[in-house]
Swiss-Prot record:
Gene Ontology BP, a term: L-ascorbic acid biosynthetic process
Any one GO molecular-function label of the UniProt entry: D-arabinono-1,4-lactone oxidase activity
Required cofactor(s): FAD
UniProt catalytic activity: L-gulono-1,4-lactone + O2 = L-ascorbate + H2O2 + H(+)
Keyword list, A-Z: Ascorbate biosynthesis, FAD, Flavoprotein, Oxidoreductase, Signal
Domain called FAD-binding PCMH-type: residue spans: 47-229
Signal peptide coordinates: 1-18
Superkingdom classification of source: Eukaryota
GO terms under cellular component: membrane
Protein's name according to its UniProt entry: Probable L-gulonolactone oxidase 1
Enzyme class: oxidoreductase
EC number(s) on file: 1.1.3.8
Pathway(s) of this molecule: Cofactor biosynthesis; L-ascorbate biosynthesis
């Protein structure tokens, strides 16, 4: 206990800067013969994505020239952002002959209009830059994800969001008034077409481009409709989760920026009471989220080794004890929020929107030889995880929460793996006019949990409980998966859940009739060809399939395909203890002559 708390304190003494993340694109010869990955160093299927070359345009004119050349040559094209935080294979081209277009240097402000409260930026601008540029004009982006390392193009491509039911909701794309898109063209167009999209010019094209998965072309520029600067008043409160099902339905109507951190094995919820207040309200608060700060690589390696030890030994007691220490520590330091940028003196914490909405100081760039880094940097022994994220309709949230509670009642230690990553983050979203945006008011559940870095066939402690939650959400509660997160199975048949999918596909056909910006992966998730699931030995362990056979799990290690415990239609990899040569399931069938 003393060692663990000392280690946490050691990590708490974080640094002002860290080694910046590596470029996700690596090439053997100049900008040719390349591979691309994401910021975590692995896709859900652990495949290596290759491309013939990568291009780094610095202006829209250069971007237009690159798209024209690729179209003329009939090459597949995908867009790569500065850090590539999407977990699925959204950046991969098919085969080895495609072209990657990086927006790394498309990172400039194009124009401002303080009177109209608009800001136009290139698509490679990061959320951090966007927030800062808006603040210079005394304007604010009202909602955004909590991690500021995403780019404008990445935000738009995957439908990234914050947390709110108020106004237009929490999705960044719903605060966009205009998009410039560069797409393939006909020979008569010079093989390229630049479109200016807005609600007034062509609503269907604009609504398709708001969340496009990169299949319509390259976003060149985006114009944001901002709001006058305001402040926020934030208080975190931890309570037991006895009435959480009821609270979850109504809490978002009471607080504009409400969210939750649910610790189901501990029976606790952290409520975020977060409201807009006038800009002249006293307070200089700053939210520098602790897990997004630079961390000592040696400390991260020790923490990861402890986690690996818990998994290999099957020791849920240690996992639960450490999870409680981590969550208690983070709550005790208010997750990194301070009243004056230096210290936390008490709630409420009041600060300007640009200081309270997003953070990510581990991106601050000074090369230090990886002495410090972002916790998930694949070059070190640090965090490596699955991330399952989905939106449950608000009208059905109480039932979903109660189902999870029922699982915890069966085995209280089963979800400590989620709490070791600070619990289930739950954010409010609302319906969006974007064709691939959210369909209705909902709560977005974000589950982060251990993944073996070296062995895709390694089962996880109590993995059947998390798999059951995943399948329960997707199949029983008709949840919408987050486009930029998730394992393959979450996208099985997903396009059928969007009422405007056919209209989106018509726009796609108009923008890119040859499918140069489409890939095998995008065709699968859009329901055009094939299926995202991959059926093979051990496929269910990493969410590549839903098991239908013991071989899809890890039978040699005692993990067999079994029905869910609460959602019995689920098929999950369960650790089965054998007695007298038969597991419990087989003994049951023998008793009733079922085999």
């Amino acid at each position: 206990m003393a060692f663990w708390l000392s280690l946490i304190f050691f990590c708490f003494c974080t640094f002002a800067s860290s080694t910046p993340p590596d470029d996700p694109v690596k090439c053997e010869s100049g900008n040719n013969m390349c591979t691309v990955t994401n910021s975590y160093g692995a896709f859900p299927d652990r495949s290596i994505c290759e491309a013939a070359k990568v291009e780094y345009p610095k202006t829209e004119a250069e971007l237009v020239s690159i798209v024209a050349a690729a179209t003329r040559a009939g090459q597949k094209v995908r867009v790569v952002t500065r850090y590539v935080h999407s977990i699925p294979k959204l950046v991969c081209t098919d085969g080895k002959d495609g072209v990657l277009i990086s927006t790394k240097f498309l990172n400039n402000v194009v124009g401002t209009n303080p009177e109209a409260k608009t800001l136009t930026v290139e698509s490679g601008v990061t959320l951090r830059q966007l927030i800062g540029e808006a603040a210079e004009l005394e304007l604010a982006l009202p909602h955004a994800p909590y991690w500021w390392g995403l780019t404008v193009g990445g935000l738009m491509g995957t439908g990234a969001h914050g947390s709110s039911l108020w106004g237009k909701g929490s999705a960044v794309h719903d605060y966009v008034s205009e998009i410039r898109m560069v797409s393939p063209g006909l020979a008569s167009d010079g093989y390229v077409k630049v479109r200016v999209l807005s609600e007034t010019i062509d609503p269907d094209e604009f609504r398709a481009a708001k969340v496009s998965l990169g299949v319509l072309g390259v976003i060149s520029q985006v114009t944001f409709q901002l709001q006058p600067m305001f402040k926020r008043s934030l208080t975190f409160v931890m309570q037991n989760d006895s009435d959480f099902g009821d609270q979850a339905v109504t809490f978002g109507e009471k607080h504009e920026f409400a969210d939750f951190l649910w610790l189901p094995s501990q029976g606790k919820v952290v409520y975020r009471m977060d409201d807009r207040v006038p800009v002249n309200t006293s307070g200089n608060g700053l939210f520098d989220f602790f897990p997004f700060r630079p961390q000592l690589s040696v400390a991260l390696a020790i923490i990861r080794s402890l986690e690996e030890s818990e998994e290999s030994s099957g020791d849920a007691n240690d996992k639960c004890a450490r999870a409680e220490q981590i969550t208690s520590f983070l709550f005790s330091i208010s997750y990194g929020v301070t009243n004056n940028g230096m210290e936390f003196t008490g709630y409420p914490v009041i600060g300007k929107q640009n200081h309270m909405m997003s953070s990510g100081t581990c991106l601050d760039s000074h090369q230090d030889g990886l002495i410090t880094s972002c916790p998930w940097d694949p070059r070190i022994k640090g965090q490596f995880f699955h991330q399952t994220a989905f939106s449950i309709p608000l009208t059905r949230v109480k039932g979903f929460i109660n189902d999870i509670k029922a699982l915890v009642k069966i085995e209280p230690k089963s979800l400590c793996a989620l709490e070791r990553s600070n619990g289930i983050l739950i954010r409010y979203v609302t319906s969006s006019p974007a064709f691939l945006g959210k369909e209705e008011k909902a709560l977005d559940f974000d589950l982060t949990y251990y993944r073996s870095k070296d062995d895709p066939l390694a089962p996880r402690l109590y993995e059947d409980f998390i798999e059951e939650i995943e399948q329960m959400a997707i199949f029983k509660y008709n949840a919408l998966p987050h486009w930029g997160k998730n394992r393959n199975l979450a996208f099985d048949g997903v396009i059928r859940k969007y009422k405007n999918a056919n209209t989106f596909l018509k726009v796609k056909e108009r923008f890119d009739p040859l499918g140069l910006f489409s890939t095998e992966w995008t065709n699968q998730i859009l329901g055009l060809k094939g299926n995202v699931t991959i059926v093979k030995e051990g496929c269910a362990l990493e969410g590549l399939c839903v098991c239908s056979d013991d071989a899809h799990c890890a039978p040699k290690k005692g993990y067999l395909c079994r029905p869910g415990k609460v959602y019995t239609k689920a098929r999950v990899c369960t650790h089965v203890k054998s007695v007298n040569g038969y597991d419990d399931h087989t003994k049951f069938n023998l008793m009733f002559n079922r085999i």
